[in-house]
């Protein structure tokens, strides 16, 4: 017997699910028999008759270990004990869409990397709708992200293969990383900024990818400068951390310990230093 008082689905015979049905209200119909399907009028997610999430979401990396996976499945509504993420979360590498066993994905993944969509037949290519993060057959990033400082040492670099090459100490970025750590000219532990680097890894140009070690170490302090432009104020010391501050984030976005999200509200940050979701 389930929350609707029936054993064969949340159809009309259940009376639309009552207050004991996880807060879904009268719109909790439309689930197929067995309550695992997702009908057109299903809540997102809906606990029907037995604790199964009918629709999205699956586990996401950000929700794993924060009550999102396991106890509540990272759902958009109160689901109580209905958690599971359509097949169980495991180590949680999944995505905001249907992921099968959450970490598995569109083609079978393993330790997860890849992108949200648009992967070619070999799961290494990128289509126009590529974003982050769904597993694609093997752990490599189709488009974004490469390694970020916050993910390094936490499965983001190395085991998760979140760049197209070895990440080293991980100073990466949101864009394609090439060998991720190479710094186009040899820069040591890699970090730098979004500007281009000359062959000596000291001068700034405009066409270089990221990450690159930008500007000289003549006046360092504690990691100065900004993410764009690379003017004379963009001094980067041998620490080679990504620049602090990003356009659009305001002065509150500056932190001396660069390798962290830098927004004043943590919910608006992404795991790239001082890159904000506006």
Swiss-Prot record:
Disulfide linkage: none
Domain of life per record: Eukaryota
UniProt note on tissues of expression: Expressed in hair root but not in skin. Expressed also in lung, pancreas, ovary, testis.
Chain positions of Sequence repeats: 42-45, 48-51, 130-133, 136-139, 142-145, 239-242, 258-261, 268-271
Keywords: Keratin, Repeat
Keyword presence, Transcription: no
Region (8 X 4 AA repeats of C-C-X-P): 42-271
Cellular component terms (Gene Ontology): cytosol; intermediate filament
Protein purpose: In the hair cortex, hair keratin intermediate filaments are embedded in an interfilamentous matrix, consisting of hair keratin-associated protein (KRTAP), which are essential for the formation of a rigid and resistant hair shaft through their extensive disulfide bond cross-linking with abundant cysteine residues of hair keratins. The matrix proteins include the high-sulfur and high-glycine-tyrosine keratins.
Subunit text: Interacts with hair keratins.
Protein family (similarity comment): Belongs to the KRTAP type 5 family.
Protein's UniProt name: Keratin-associated protein 5-1
Source species of the chain: Homo sapiens (Human)
């Amino acid at each position: 017997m389930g929350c609707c008082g029936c054993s064969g689905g949340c159809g009309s015979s259940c009376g639309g699910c009552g207050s004991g049905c996880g807060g879904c209200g009268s719109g909790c119909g439309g689930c197929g028999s067995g309550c695992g399907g997702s009908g057109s009028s299903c809540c997102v997610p809906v606990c029907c008759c037995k604790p199964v999430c009918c629709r999205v979401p699956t586990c996401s990396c950000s929700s794993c270990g924060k009550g999102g996976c396991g106890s509540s499945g990272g759902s958009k509504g109160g689901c109580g004990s209905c958690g599971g993420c359509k097949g169980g979360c495991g180590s949680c590498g999944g995505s905001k869409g249907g992921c099968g066993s959450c970490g598995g994905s569109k083609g079978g993944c393993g330790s997860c990397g890849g992108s949200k969509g648009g992967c070619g037949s070999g799961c290494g290519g990128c289509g126009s709708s590529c974003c982050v993060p769904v597993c694609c057959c093997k752990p490599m990033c189709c488009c974004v992200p490469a390694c970020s400082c916050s993910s390094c040492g936490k499965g983001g670099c190395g085991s998760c293969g979140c760049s197209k090459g070895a990440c080293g100490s991980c100073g990466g970025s949101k864009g394609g990383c090439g060998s991720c750590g190479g710094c186009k000219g040899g820069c040591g532990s890699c970090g730098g900024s979004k500007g281009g680097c000359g062959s000596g890894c000291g001068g700034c140009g405009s066409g270089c990818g990221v990450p690159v070690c930008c500007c000289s170490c003549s006046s360092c302090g504690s990691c100065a400068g900004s993410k764009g432009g690379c003017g004379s104020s963009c001094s980067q010391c041998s620490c080679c951390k990504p620049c602090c501050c990003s356009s659009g984030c305001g002065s509150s976005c500056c932190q001396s310990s660069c390798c962290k999200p830098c927004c004043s509200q943590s919910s608006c940050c992404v795991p790239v230093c001082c890159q904000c979701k506006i």
